Swiss-Prot record:
Pfam families: IspD
GO molecular function list: 2-C-methyl-D-erythritol 4-phosphate cytidylyltransferase activity
Reaction catalyzed: 2-C-methyl-D-erythritol 4-phosphate + CTP + H(+) = 4-CDP-2-C-methyl-D-erythritol + diphosphate
Keywords: Isoprene biosynthesis, Nucleotidyltransferase, Transferase
Positions of the record's site feature: Positions MEP for the nucleophilic attack: 155, 211
Residues annotated as site: Transition state stabilizer: 15, 22
EC nos: 2.7.7.60
EC category name: transferase
Family to which this protein belongs: Belongs to the IspD/TarI cytidylyltransferase family. IspD subfamily.
Signal peptide: none
Protein name: 2-C-methyl-D-erythritol 4-phosphate cytidylyltransferase
Organism, as annotated: Caldanaerobacter subterraneus subsp. tengcongensis (strain DSM 15242 / JCM 11007 / NBRC 100824 / MB4)
Transmembrane found in the keyword field: no
Amino acid sequence: MNVSAVIVAAGRSTRMNKSLNKVYLSIAGKPVLYYSIKAFDEIEWIKEIIVVTSPEETEYCQENVLEKFYWNKPFKIVKGGEERQYSVYNGISVVDKDCEIVAIHDGARPLVTKEIIMEAIKAAYLYKAAAVGVPVKDTIKVADEDNFILDTPDRRYLWAIQTPQVFEKELIVKAHRKALEEGFLGTDDSVLVERMGFKVKLVEGDYKNIKITTPEDLVVAELFLRK
């Protein structure tokens, strides 16, 4: 297998009330981004890791994450765009020419495991597109603009989508280019593939695979890491 991992670390931390990007905040003595990369770095199938950063944080990432710790894989560091979707496109645009599969992961999800990543990669080889997620536990309501309930979808068919999301390289590149040409902005990568008429296979993940968004998430993540 020849897999490239794209780790997206170019987001803004507006809900953290901190000047430092959340992926560089510390959990158990190491940056959030360290843990997000580490699980991919330990997988034999993955041949390279591409880290997408904010333009103003490229040097900081290089010095405080990529050069500070020992890694097995070669790295590329790429500057991100104004939106996550553009950052992902910048990352997938520089994958190795021999790459068959691209695994895209949020740098703010430090609790992802090797096992989940590998299951998603295997699913992508079989189905061309796979996304990690978990069945929702709560009842979900669809509301109108005035916060009145319009509908209650059947919970049996609802999943909360996480990352990684893994795709055949040619498919995800085409999907991103199509979205760019048409001015479509999605909330994740799988929706871009869905727009092309492809089915995306769901791979059950872990409820612990949270995205660090608030200060409380840092506390929760550290508790899980120390277990």
